[in-house]
UniProtKB/Swiss-Prot annotation:
Single GO MF descriptor: ATP hydrolysis activity
Quaternary structure and partners: The complex is composed of two ATP-binding proteins (LolD) and two transmembrane proteins (LolC and LolE).
PANTHER family assigned to the protein according to its UniProt record, in alphabetical order: IMPORT ATP-BINDING PROTEIN, LIPOPROTEIN-RELEASING SYSTEM ATP-BINDING PROTEIN LOLD
Disulphide bonds in the chain: none
Binding site for ATP: G42, A43, S44, G45, S46, G47, K48, S49
Native organism: Hahella chejuensis (strain KCTC 2396)
Gene3D superfamilies: P-loop containing nucleotide triphosphate hydrolases (3.40.50.300)
Superkingdom of this protein's organism: Bacteria
Protein name according to UniProt: Lipoprotein-releasing system ATP-binding protein LolD
Length: 231
């Protein structure tokens, strides 16, 4: 069996508020393998976004370990984590987090430039991915000049442009109207499958979750695998 591209082992997360401790994650174990798709469902406030941030090394667990492409991030400094993320992990959020003063092309170039890709090559790759998401005619437009669906397409192109091992998505269509959401979901699914990328999807959409290879439910800090027909 191939090695996981991302793995969490016995992950706990505790927040301390004054004299009170709140345990958000309790011994979470999950592994994501090449080309695998995983959905995580759960009520609002159940810790799904916290788990996703820990999986992507944007946050650290109170205890337990995280490995990305076989590398344990536990003892890495923030610069090393950033390099590892940029090489192996893409992110798509409910809110696009595009830089408002930059064009669509410049936003998609950003992760490539951070990896040390030459400007000319980064622009070429960014143009390719914006074409893949149907925005070849919007290269010079800034986020404020794009619709909600177009902005999310730019965010998808940005996440996939470095060709990461896995993509972590937190309600990527939750801020869109149903018709636009369906279109973006179909696009995202096709692109990830075509590029043989693994992904983890945090969602409230049980119908969408059922399409993934595996489904997990996060409740009271405990992550448990569930059957698609039980969603």
């Amino acid at each position: 069996m191939s090695s996981p591209v991302l793995k969490c082992q016995s992950v706990h997360k505790v927040y301390v508020q004054g004299k009170e401790s709140i345990e958000v994650l309790r011994g979470v174990n999950i592994a994501l393998y090449p080309e695998q798709t995983v959905a995580i469902v759960g009520a609002s406030g159940s810790g799904k976004s916290t788990l996703l941030n820990i999986m992507g090394a944007l946050d650290h667990p109170s205890s337990g370990s995280i490995s990305i492409s076989g590398q344990d991030v536990s003892d890495m400094d923030e610069k090393a984590k950033a390099r590892l993320r940029n090489a192996h992990v893409g992110f798509v959020y409910q809110f696009h987090h595009l830089l408002p003063e930059f064009s669509a092309l410049e936003n998609v170039c950003m992760p490539l430039l951070l990896r040390g890709v030459a400007v000319k090559e980064a622009k070429k790759e960014a143009e390719y991915w914006l074409g893949r998401v149907g925005l070849s005619h919007r290269l010079k437009h800034r986020p404020g000049q794009l619709s909600g669906g177009e902005r999310q397409r730019v965010a998808i192109a940005r996440a996939l442009s470095p060709r990461p091992s896995c993509v972590l998505m937190d309600e990527p269509t939750g801020n869109l109207d149903p018709e636009t959401a369906e279109s973006v979901q179909a696009l995202l699914w096709d692109l990830v499958r075509q590029n043989q990328t693994s992904f983890v999807l945090v969602t409230h959409d049980y119908r969408l979750a059922a399409r993934m290879d595996e489904q997990y439910s996060l409740e009271e800090g405990v992550l448990a695998k569930v059957a698609p027909n039980s969603l």
